[in-house]
Amino acid sequence: MVWALTPVDTVRGAQRCYIFAAGTYKVGRKDCDVIVQTDTSISRVHAEIVVEKMVAWDPQSGAPANPSYVRVVDRSKYGTFFNKVQGTQGSRLHKDEDAMLADGDTVTFGTGSATFRLSFVPIVVFFHGKKSGRISPSLQAVMTSIGAYATRKWSDECTHVLVDESCSLTPELLDAVLAKKQIVLGDWFKVMAEKNIHTAMPSSTQYIPKLTLDGMEIQVVEIKLIESCLAGYTFILGSSEKYKFGDKLHALLESTGAKYLHVDEFCANSQDSGAGENDKDILLVPAKSPLEFSKISGLFPLSKITDVKLFAAILSGHLEATAIEPPAYIVASSNSTDETIVVDSDVEIDTATSDHTVAASKSEHHIEHISDDKKEVVAISEEDAVNLVEAKTSINLHSYQEKDEIVKPMEEDVKVIEKTATMRGFKVEGEDIPVMTKVPKDETLDSRDETCHVIYTQNLVVKSILQSARAESIETGGINFKRFRKRGAVSGNSFKDLIPYSREPYRESDYKRGTVIDFMREEKKRRQMEAIAEDLFNNAKPKKKAAAGSSIHTMLTGRR
């Protein structure tokens, strides 16, 4: 066990000290192991705390070892008092006198209020290793030097858990986490033994091991970081026996600040209050049977996490988003694509269109669509059935002829594809025929919510309810990919845009129009005018200089 000197009153310059090894430790005002700066009655070296040896404490004995092997020796002028109670002097030690101290005794240095209490801090180590394994002799010697007691039996009196690196997670380790006992490596005890005396217990952050669970490596953190690491989350659980370490699961969730509900309770609440819309409601799925709750429709909107990943999140102190499986949204099975809106546009006259208008009623017909592996019955109206026959007629005009009246085609009917169109595929006499039926403009907005099939084919039949278009067969030739090109469209990088100053960009020469001859004549005239101006300017300079010189000479000589 480790000894601690704790100030009874909060006085200036007094701190708690931990003694980790046997030895002699000085108490005084300056340059001492225990510094006390309360009043002038404290000597420079006032007393000494002598620890003859460190004694281990066996929790089964119920009391610390006796004797404690801790003595106090007075080295001061004003004396040292032990077990001094308020209102009494206690036992005073004169210079060079000593006294044996026990757990809970108080020591007062000087005549002031510098009172410290001696108490033992037990270190009971639960050794979690292989059943046949033992603590190494070197580590055992270190633990003995600091008074640590090692045991292989877990109990609530254990203060620390000693494990090897990459040790497997067991129920005993989970019990230690629930009891807020730190899991450490053997190097932590070596660091403690090297300090001898210190104002705080050494940190175990760098000496926390990694555990393994079903092949997953878990980096354990300090116990204080595990607390409330899952606060705000609600886990939906099944029966405890379905999960790994199921008997520890509820207690672990409570210790981390999380809530939990049973599957039946959650389903009952979801029907009444619409539960399950919260992102922090997570379904806990057993790793050994991931499809355990796949048949319960009320759990479909929930995110999922396996019990193994949940234990890893608890021991690591945080729940990563990658460990959570997002909910599986149900998408209705349909053979239709998204709604397609085709804006009115100009189409070239050579676009292959055909339309034959016939009378139709609203009675329903059924046409079988036989695929390679299944048969699908599609219900269509008689109008669609007539459109189907007309589509077949437009593809093979020589094979099938309609007896109904054929309206004279018009070129404006090429623009028959407007706001919304519906494509249906049918199989008639062994040949697939796509039919596109135009929806009138005055259709209600609800029709836009319906799904549509828009499939391109060179034999596409475009039907207009109001007008019909001229039909041209293209079966003899290949696919005309320019059929949808706008007439008169000009590229953005045209010659006209790049060279805007050219009158006729495709004319190689302008000699025929006389523009070059006129330009040369004007240029020659301009140069002649510049030469004349230059001569006049140069001839005017000497005259000005001569006139200026004669006038100065006249002024100097006084002649006129």
From Swiss-Prot:
Q: Which GO terms describe its biological process?
A: cellular response to ionizing radiation; DNA damage response; double-strand break repair via homologous recombination; mitotic G2 DNA damage checkpoint signaling; mitotic recombination; reciprocal meiotic recombination
Keyword flag Nucleus = yes
The UniProt entry's GO CC annotations, sorted and at most eight, read: chromosome; Mre11 complex
Where does it reside?
Nucleus; Chromosome
- Protein name per the record: Nibrin homolog
What family does the database annotate? Belongs to the Nibrin family.
Q: What is known of its domains?
A: The FHA and BRCT domains are likely to have a crucial role for both binding to histone H2AFX and for relocalization of MRE11/RAD50 complex to the vicinity of DNA damage.
Extract the PROSITE patterns matched here. Answer: FHA_DOMAIN
- Name of the gene: NBS1
- Native organism is Oryza sativa subsp. indica
Keyword GTP-binding part of the UniProt annotation: no
Identify the domain of life.
Eukaryota
